[in-house]
Amino acid sequence: MRDPDALIARAGVRGDPERDQHFLVDNRVLDRLPGYLPDDADTSHVLEIGGGTGGLTDRLLSAAYRVTVVERDPTLAAFLREEFTEEIEADRLSVIEGDALEIELPSFTASVSNLPYGVSSEIAFRLLPAGRPLVLMFQLEFAERMAAAPGTDEYGRLSVT
């Protein structure tokens, strides 16, 4: 597995909170995420939104037959294409440069993503109609609103759906 800190160093970037970039670097979390898909999930084509420097992408390639990454940052999309050249040439990985809220998303059998915090609800609502298994990482406050019980301050549109 590729080391997430080494990927960030090779990419020559830092997460930029103002651009909603938060890179996941905890190997324990990265290693577990693909395993949260249901045991019977079809992993023939997994979609990742916000590939960043590829820490999760690398893990998904070990768990899925094919992965498509949507990355809106041109620098990071170019880095992913360079870092994962072999996987792209083997037709196991596609990198789409674009905003997941604006582009036409490819068909997929499951999605595992560390979503950009500022648009996590919009992306989640975009993925849900596909009816496919989703493993989505959210900011804690967002997750609390999503799981809120009726009558609590956090209860709202996210809780109802």
Question: Where are the language model's segments positioned?
Answer:
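Catalytic cores of RNA-modifying enzymes
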Residues: 1-161
